[in-house]
């Protein structure tokens, strides 16, 4: 457990007690502090490492509650709402005792980041919504279904396609950590623009990624509804919206909508990326964040 304030931003892994729960995070790089919130929910943090950003930012990669080395809620697997996640981030920023931070959220982490920025704008120096969306639900799933069909058509005849599509189809119905991890590893090619053409680059990541089951329900068993469209029009935090052209789950349609909704935001579409532009086009990704 890291206890001394001077050590909280030293390089490496840290554990702190926040609101009675153990919170784990990892520090790399130097410069202004940027908290990075991974997707999932439940996916291990390390896929989100972005060495290019670490050249000019102190990256604080958060392991969200219920994930990896961070403690589970008593209501696990329920209760991991955006409000609860944002509360944890506020406590972490307080403990770090730093000025307003940069905040980068990827995928589900983007949903958390935009909630945080909307409710705690005074804590945020700049916001990066990376593969996020302003709303989820039926419309979001319909768009994802159409994008998956496009992916399947582009990759027709690939030996690994049936397994990847099966993983995508089954992952949402699983509640066992090991089975979810297996399905996640199976479906990962769908989340890249050109996975099979670049398999040597991404094979190790696919083999090591893990996921814990976290539901989409609050502690009372009610859905944690995401629809930020109205409130995003009031967001005054400087915001960069990033999306991969070939992302099937939070692609350009949602990035463009975020950009339209958020005043004075910037939009960058990574033309040869899927869901993981920081891995697929790291130089372009880094340049967009640095700008």
Where do the protein language model's features map onto the residues?
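Conserved HGGG/HGGXW glycine-rich cap/lid loop of the alpha/beta-hydrolase fold
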Residues: 15-78, 92
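Active-site loop/oxyanion-hole signature of alpha/beta-hydrolase fold enzymes
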Residues: 61-104, 108, 287
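Conserved hydrolase catalytic core segment
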Residues: 99-143
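Short beta-strand/loop motif that positions the catalytic acidic residue
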Residues: 235, 241-243
């Amino acid at each position: 457990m890291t206890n001394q304030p001077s050590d909280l931003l030293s390089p490496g892994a840290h554990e702190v007690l926040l609101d009675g729960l153990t919170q784990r995070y990892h520090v790399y790089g130097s410069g202004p502090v940027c908290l990075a919130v991974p997707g999932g929910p439940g996916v291990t943090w390390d896929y989100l490492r972005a060495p290019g950003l670490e050249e000019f930012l102190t990256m604080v990669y958060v392991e969200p509650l219920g994930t990896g080395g961070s403690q589970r809620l008593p209501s696990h697997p329920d209760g991991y709402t955006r409000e609860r996640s944002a509360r944890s981030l506020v406590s972490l920023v307080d403990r770090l005792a730093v000025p307003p931070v940069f905040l980068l959220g990827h995928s589900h982490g983007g949903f958390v980041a935009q909630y945080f920025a909307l409710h705690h704008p005074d804590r945020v120096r700049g916001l990066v919504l990376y593969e996020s969306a302003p709303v989820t639900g039926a419309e979001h799933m319909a768009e994802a279904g159409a994008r998956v069909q496009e992916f399947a058509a582009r990759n027709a005849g690939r030996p690994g396609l049936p397994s990847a599509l099966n993983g995508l189809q089954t992952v949402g119905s699983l509640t066992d950590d090991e089975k979810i991890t297996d399905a996640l590893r199976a479906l990962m090619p769908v989340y890249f623009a050109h996975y099979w053409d670049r398999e040597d680059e991404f094979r190790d990541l696919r083999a090591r990624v893990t996921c814990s089951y976290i539901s989409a329900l609050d502690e009372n068993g009610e859905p944690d509804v995401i629809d930020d469209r109205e409130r995003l029009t009031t967001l005054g935090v400087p915001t960069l919206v990033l999306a991969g052209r070939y992302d099937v789950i939070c692609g350009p349609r949602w990035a463009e909508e975020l950009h339209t909704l958020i005043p004075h935001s910037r939009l960058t579409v990574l033309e040869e990326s899927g869901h993981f532009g920081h891995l697929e086009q790291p130089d372009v990704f880094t340049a967009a964040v640095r700008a």
